[in-house]
Amino acid sequence: MLQVCYNTWKSAKKIHFCAKKREDLIMCGIVGYIGESQAAPILLDGLSKLEYRGYDSAGIAVYNGTEIEVVKSKGRLKVLSEMTHDGSMMPGTLGIGHTRWATHGEPSDINAHPHFNKDESIVVVHNGIIENYLKLKKKLEAKGYQFISDTDTEVIAHLLDYYYTGNPLQAVTKIMHRMEGSYALGIIFRDHPDELYAVRKDSPLIVGHTEGGNIIASDVPAVLKYTRDVFFIENEEIVRMTKDSMEFFTVDEEPLEKESTHIDWDVNAAEKGGYEHFMLKEMYEQPKAITDTFSPRVKEGKIVIDELGMTDEEIRGIKKIMIVACGSAYHTGVTSKYIFEGLARIPVEVDLASEFRYRDPIIEEGTMVIVISQSGETADSLAALREAKKRGARVLGIVNVVGSSIAREADNVMYTWAGPEIAVATTKAYSAQLVAHYLLAMKFAHVRGKLGDTELAAMLEDLRRLPEQVEMLLNNKQKIQKFANRYLAARDIFFIGRGIDYAISLEGSLKLKEISYIHSEAYAAGELKHGTISLIEEGTLVSAVLTQPELYKKMISNMVEVKTRGAFVMAVTNTGNTEVEKAADYVIYIPKTNKYFTNSLAIIPLQLFGYYVSIGRGCDVDKPRNLAKSVTVE
């Protein structure tokens, strides 16, 4: 029997719990290790690199030579570290660890991972959702299995027990045939103490060789300290590892040959590097992310995107572009629509990935679909990609993580070389995605004869100046911090813009609300009179973005409308547009650049504003409540 202990280390027993409340959510992180080193410190270190994914509880399991010892803790990893003295009190060189976002069963001591079978001889950690778990649970209960948690993961442990007859691989393949949904699994069998199993279906998982062992993880940052060469596990694949070997199998137990992928990310890029928060550090890394994304693709005054895999004739044959994404990536897609249509004269549709796959989209010959995702694992975007391919579209993925699912499944992939992004609220990956869109639109426009050599050269020169201009805006942070401190108690903040400026407003609003928890919405300024203006009252902050000269007069008119009704107006506009000062109470000027590139500059003060409002309110900037970095379930 298990003894449950609260906030106390009982060396003779194996289960330990602590408490903290959190909302139901969707994201998890897995780390597993087998080798010559002590497992627990490696598990804790790896899980700490996955904290950005969000979690409400954490746990590790280690085989200590005679039994599998499990330690679970609600709340932050530091509680788990304190309970185990940074893992030193858990001997053993085989283990699995987990950070959990609740999906089935509330965040609680019992529901935290790892989970085990009735005699604690099989231990499992799981990312994803088992859609038929209630049906499986009912059948297992009918056979005498008892459940102590409300999770779908415990069903996996008991199902393994039901099928296990001494052959772990056989048991794993049998449960895979029974389970419906998405999952990444790490599994330990007590009577096979020299083996660690990893399984994947629709939830990301990587494995890699370390010095003296092997490691599994949900994402690259967890393994950078130990290896740069990883294997990306594909759907319905199984990995059997010992400390010296790694074997890959299909769901039908057929052996597989796989090639590793080398990861060039700097290990220090996954650390704070002296900054107070990852988000602040990553904001300051935006100049480098912009440079690293465009520099390799501009050669001798020409845009060269070899990974696009398209001839000039094929580019000229594109009749429509559909852009599919979620969150901030969707906002870069909205920006891209204005640029592609303005420069290349190609009609563009922009869809939320969660809507695209269910609306029966019309994809005709000559349609190109662009799927955007920082992680390359976003579930809705991945499903949309598969739907587009099924309908015959050519699919280009724009992703940041090398070897990710979208990168592997798209016809072609264009990487944004932003490096690992840890903060949940994206900054540098967003900026790199914008640059990828700029390059694509300019390339298409030039090939299709809509952009001449002289115009292209001028735009490339403006693009080269962007990193320096971004850095200049970042160095103006004190002014923005002082202004942000005036709005720490704001109830509502609204963002307005027209054209590309509306796309900027969408992202500025999202940045603010996701990390400060202040209600915020972005509106196309022309829609104010159709209902939104009724929300404006005395003292309401309205952020107006106006970077498009042809829309200055219209925007200033909108600013006067809200100001007349008591709003305090903050404006973000181009240097030299002093007319705006007649309608704004506070103005932030950005350097002059090509009108299609203004998003890259106007977003910087809005990122800083959101950051400093959040800091002033005492919010967790890097890990805001109820959010995950990469949403890998629907």
Predicted regions located by residue number:
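Conserved short alpha-helical segments that host acidic/polar catalytic motifs at enzyme active sites
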Residues: 16, 21-272, 276, 288-320, ...
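Glycine-rich oxoanion-binding loops at beta->alpha junctions
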Residues: 93, 97-110, 299-312, 336-372, ...
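Active-site phosphate/pyrophosphate-binding segments
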Residues: 286-290, 294-322, 412-541, 614-634
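Glycine-rich phosphate-binding loops that contact phosphosugars or nucleotide phosphates
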Residues: 316-458, 462-465, 545-588, 609, ...
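Generic C-terminus detector
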Residues: 568, 593-634
